Amino acid sequence: VLVDSAGASGGAHAVVKEVFSEIGTLDLWRVAIPPGKPLAYGSAPRPDGGYCLLFGLPGNPVSSYVTFELFVRPVLRRLRGEDPFGGRLRTAATLTGPVRKSAGRRAFIRVRLEEDGDQPGRWLAHLAGRQGSHVLSALALADGLAIIPEDTPGAEAGAEVEVIRLDVEIA
């Protein structure tokens, strides 16, 4: 497995698409998620007759982290013989603030989780800060990624969302 970070953007210095196409095949170039739209995936032949999986992650640090969690980590788990989606716990939570996004793209919003004092066993999801793909502070504060479905323009405070826990990994 070869993982490149910062070479899959759409800018002038993004060489991953060209290189992956030269050494093997490029099977995927973009995904409809913020953060993380530029994502390259392909494979290249190895000298022993096998193949090497190629991943090109976006250049913005938050985008790179999110695409790694969603696309690369499950592949690495599968290659180790583990359940590809068993590594991260998912939980339901209630948003404490509104989220706006473009319709047509599933969004992964950095949130801080807090147990709901009024309802034991329930979680509240607070926005971890500004949500730009370059804002590392929100990622550093986050312990979850709230999933906002692609068919909505966002979610209001009080909406129930699914959250991928970043603070807990299960076997």
Q: Where do the PLM segments sit?
A:
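Flexible glycine/proline-rich
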Residues: V19-A171
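N-terminal small/polar loop signature for handling phosphorylated ligands or for N-terminal nucleophile
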Residues: V1-E22
